[in-house]
Amino acid sequence: MVTRGPDTGALSTDVVRAGRHPESDIFLDDITVSRRHAEIVRAGDAYRVRDVGSLNGTYLNRERIEDAPLRNGDELQIGKFKLVFFEGGE
């Protein structure tokens, strides 16, 4: 769920793309963010985050990751942006 910014609302697709590309599901407009930076993927009741080849990396709870499970309350850092993952917030 996005709670602040231009993309506010629940994200209901199985793959959510975050990046500087204007057509990203979560548009993060800053030079520290790659055009195609990261994806949040839902598989059943589980969620994962994966970096998709970004220059500056994707961080989960302050650790750089390539692919990792997401849990409620986890903090993602993409470039200068910090995002907190909340599951099931319609």
List each model region and its residues.
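Short linear Ser/Thr-Pro motifs
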Residues: 24, 32-34, 54
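C-terminal boundary/linker segments immediately following FHA domains
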Residues: 59-90
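Intrinsically disordered, low-complexity acidic Ser/Thr-rich regulatory segments
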Residues: 1-29, 41, 82
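Hydrophobic aliphatic residue packing
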Residues: 26, 33, 49, 65, ...
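Intrinsically disordered, low-complexity regions of eukaryotic proteins
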Residues: 9, 27, 41, 53, ...
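Short hydrophobic/aromatic patches on the structural cores and recognition surfaces of FHA
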Residues: 18, 36-60, 73, 83
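A short, sequence-level motif marking secondary-structure junctions
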Residues: 13-17, 30-34, 70, 89-90
